[in-house]
């Protein structure tokens, strides 16, 4: 019995020892595998100089970029800029960071301070910042072949030169340009990783006043005094949504013009009604013109398309008020002429009778006795008209004929013609306006 227990205890001891040995061998193999694929950062960067670029003194570092446009929060016409939040990803190969295996590992963002990274900056940026909540929004990832992926989340405000001459039917072209600050083309070469496909997110953006029509990427060279620098350009076109402005400005201004035409159907004798309509429409049009410029600075020197249309509408509204002034004045003149008519006729008859009755005696009274004769000199000044008086008489006669030619004989015709001409000319002005600004 005791012999059997001894044999069982011996077998159990041998089995336990063998299992421990096999377990230690497995742990050693796993640790060795991890050490080969995921080396310690200190061992990997031993002798690493972050102040020297990869291939220092040799071929330039080729950096491939991709962009994700998270949002375009604002587009300011007054400041000529736009604000966007982007995810910038850069890839390059650093032979000093090669390790065995086919795996990759992500480092803590704070370790980027110990590695060389490109000095990429955004050209024409007014202000930019890196997001820091809850930690710095940066990512650094190492691959076994030495490839480094460096990603950043940035919000930037970039200049965008705008041509507002066709506002609000304009299309603006904005750019986002990336370039190395200190390394020229002999040290760093930038490129888009997948061409136009390197940029994502623009097609999904929904902007308040704009629609993104198209975008494309370019690679150019920036020539500066310090050298030639590779520049990556993202160019995109923004077309303004005109429907908002049609409802806010164009429709109200058109209604005011039509409202001013109501006075053509009101009698000329209704002075308060027609004057009230004319003055009210003029003041309303002025208020609308001032309100349309509140979104743009007063120093803006552009004559915009919306200003042209509001100017046209204001001209028609003010013209309707002047039309009533002309018609009313002509009506008063006609009434005055009618009142003076009988008296003037009797006056002309009396004068004619006096002249006819006195002309014979007038002829008899003219004698050569009134002519002063002194030797051979004869003074005819009392019998002839001076040249200056004759010129004045002819000039007054011409002016009188011109005034009579332009005098409105029937003031009611002014309203009758205005009912046709004002709408016709306004429609023609709209046809030319929309055709020019929409298609030219």
UniProtKB/Swiss-Prot annotation:
Residues 263-270, 323-419 are cytoplasmic. Keywords: Cell membrane, Chloride, Chloride channel, Disulfide bond, Glycoprotein, Ion channel, Ion transport, Membrane, Signal, Transmembrane, Transmembrane helix, Transport. One of its GO terms (cellular component) is plasma membrane. It is a multi-pass membrane protein. Residues 1-23 form the signal peptide. Glycans are attached at residues 43, 102, 145, 196, 228. Disulfide bonds join 160-174. Gene3D superfamilies: Neurotransmitter-gated ion-channel ligand-binding domain, Neurotransmitter-gated ion-channel transmembrane domain. Its main location: membrane. The chain crosses the membrane at residues 242-262, 271-290, 302-322, 420-440. GO terms for molecular function: GABA-A receptor activity; GABA-gated chloride ion channel activity. Residues 24-241, 291-301 are extracellular. It catalyses: chloride(in) = chloride(out). The keyword Disulfide bond applies. It is found in: Cell membrane; Apical cell membrane. Pi subunit of the heteropentameric ligand-gated chloride channel gated by gamma-aminobutyric acid (GABA). GABA-gated chloride channels, also named GABA(A) receptors (GABAAR), consist of five subunits arranged around a central pore and contain GABA active binding site(s) located at the alpha and beta subunit interfaces. When activated by GABA, GABAARs selectively allow the flow of chloride anions across the cell membrane down their electrochemical gradient. Pi-containing GABAARs are mostly located in peripheral tissues. GABAARs subunits share a common topological structure: a peptide sequence made up of a long extracellular N-terminal, four transmembrane domains, intracellular or cytoplasmic domain located between the third and the fourth transmembrane domains. This is Gamma-aminobutyric acid receptor subunit pi. The gene is Gabrp.
